[in-house]
Each structure stands twice: as C-alpha cells, then as structure tokens.
C-alpha cells in the first residue's frame, strides 16, 4: 500500500473588515510505495503493469492567496482573487534504482520531472559543429554515459488572477492563468 506523511501549516489574515483576505501556506508531503505503471517489454503484449514503486518522493511548496472585495453595493459588486504556488519535489530514496528500468529517468535528490541532456560546451569556431562534454572521457559522445546534465522541466511557479464583476442579475467572471 502507498504510504503518505503530510504536514501543512497556514496563516490567514483578514484586513479592512475582511475586504482584503490573505492566506499563506506551506506544505510537505512524503510518499512511498506509490502505485505506478512499471514498463514492460513489447513482447508481453502490454505496455506496463501496476506495481508499487520502491521509492520515496517529497513534495513541498508555498501557496499565497489574496482575495479582495473592491466594490460592493446594492446593484454592483467587484471581487478579485490572486493566487500563486511555488511547488518543489524530489526523489528522496529509491532502493535498487541503478538496476531498475528508471535508472536513466530519475536521480536521487533531483526533481521527478527531469530530462538528462548532454552538457553543451559551445560551437567549434573552425567547423561550426556543436561541442558537448565527454563526461566519461572515452573520446565519444554516447548515451547514457555522457548524457548527465540534469534539466528540471517542472514549473517554477504558477497561479492566476480572477475577477468577478456583477451588475444587478448579470455576472462576468474572467481568469488569467500563468506558469513559469
């Protein structure tokens, strides 16, 4: 069975009779024994089988929210909500990683959504050919030996800005989302 340990703490604060309401939260989730699809060879007739992954993954993050009531009266209301989240995750442990099908996909201490890449050194000014680091020193650029630079593809942060404008019985909602 999957095991989860969760911790969350938050601070909420209302100002100006709750016309401005602010929330800040921190969370940490540690999961182990996750149920995942383990890749199978094509000769089996199946792409994967469900099994427990022998790994420990930690997700942490900060979340901030600001809700405001900008204008409110008998016939007109305008409310705004802004939120931003800064998530992080990493592989804490994975017993037997080097002998698993995931050895080229995950690294202990790194985020889960990584891509291994060759370390780009520049362009040879004489030939115009891209130059990459020969990590293992064998004179050839090969996979997987030289593809060791970790590139994190996870978003640094994401959030949104929502506004709700209401006039009598008409309401207009619009939302802008962002990701970096």
Regions found by a protein language model. Give the residues of each.
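Membrane-embedded beta-barrel scaffold of Gram-negative outer-membrane proteins
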Residues: 1-45, 78, 85, 89-92
